From Swiss-Prot:
Keywords: Iron, Manganese, Metal-binding, Oxidoreductase, Stress response. Belongs to the iron/manganese superoxide dismutase family. This is Superoxide dismutase [Mn/Fe]. It holds the Pfam family Sod_Fe_C. SUPFAM superfamilies: Fe,Mn superoxide dismutase (SOD), C-terminal domain, Fe,Mn superoxide dismutase (SOD), N-terminal domain. It catalyses: 2 superoxide + 2 H(+) = H2O2 + O2. It comes from Staphylococcus carnosus.
Amino acid sequence: MAFELPNLPYEFDALEPYIDKETMEIHHDKHHNTYVTKLNAAIEGTDLENKSIEEIVANLDSVPSDIQTAVRNNGGGHLNHSLFWQLLTPNSEEKGTVIDKIKEEWGSLDKFKDEFAKKAAGQFGSGWAWLVVDKDGKLEIVSTPNQDNPITEGKTPILGLDVWEHAYYLKYQNKRPDYIDAFWNVVNWNKVDELYEAATK
């Protein structure tokens, strides 16, 4: 079965002024849509059509070598963006079990944000910054290049930030740190909490 572009759970302008409407439209309707189209083309006629995107990206080594790069890039792009849209909200509230765990691990939410921001700002070129739950149930901040996802390494992402230039350049140009600062105003902590609970069951 072909993968489909998911609908956004809010309007394109809902995250203004932090993430602008035009960026959201291009990011979702053009960039994400392209990943879906290219992923479907790559896996057409293979057993991968019957697997979930999580199964595919978590087991890239089992993908046939002739389509592995296309699946890694476009499958990762589809998975990452499908999660990213859910991790954003115009009604951000800093509460929940995961907030308490973050404070335990990093000392304060602000210290965590600083460490996450360093990882996001320090990602050379295109990529993502993530808060993940590792195999032992511990929280960790990691970054991945391009459209790689931490599940390939056996880690469960519960918060992610797209630091590809297409995610912020229209509004922030080369000022990636300003985009990272703005991100905290639209984080869907309810979703992060839900993902944390599922990952630590």
